[in-house]
Amino acid sequence: VSEAVGRKMINAARDSMKMGFVTGAEVLKKRALVQKISTGSENFDTLMDGGFETNAITECFGEFGSGKTQVGHILAVNTIKEDPEAYVVYLDTENTFRPERIIQLANGAGVDPDDALNRIMVARAYNSDHQMLLTEQVDGLVTEQGKKVKLVVVDSLTAHFRAEFVGR
């Protein structure tokens, strides 16, 4: 690809992303569409100002065994509970997704476990390149398959990058 063609491709991609300035009124209008996903814990939801926001990136971090994966599982079930048309994408980099746990949580939340499992789209990422590819494919779930993806869980976002890019 020549430099001129490459530049045209980059400019077309930028145009399609609508990057640039918007008015404060437009930001307010978009913020009105933001919803909160409950954790089911009143104290945790209070700490998170009502729950985890949609259209946002929220990182949970902590020591091994501190409950990060459980938060992802809980948010997945609660997203499905709160919106009967919602789908959840779960990008699993460390093979920690447990359908058995989803069943337990769904039963506890009064959600049909089969429905919950059918609306959680799980992909196992085997390295950082595969993780990036899967991330790019989420858009296709929405645009091509018409799925109302309301939550994307990446467990763990940094695991492959830490392992593959040591010291960088």
Model-derived features: positions:
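The Walker A/P-loop phosphate-binding site
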Residues: 9-115, 119
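Conserved inter-motif catalytic segment of the P-loop NTP-binding fold
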Residues: 83-168
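Helix-hairpin-helix
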Residues: 1-10
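General structural signal for secondary-structure boundaries
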Residues: 2, 23-24, 127
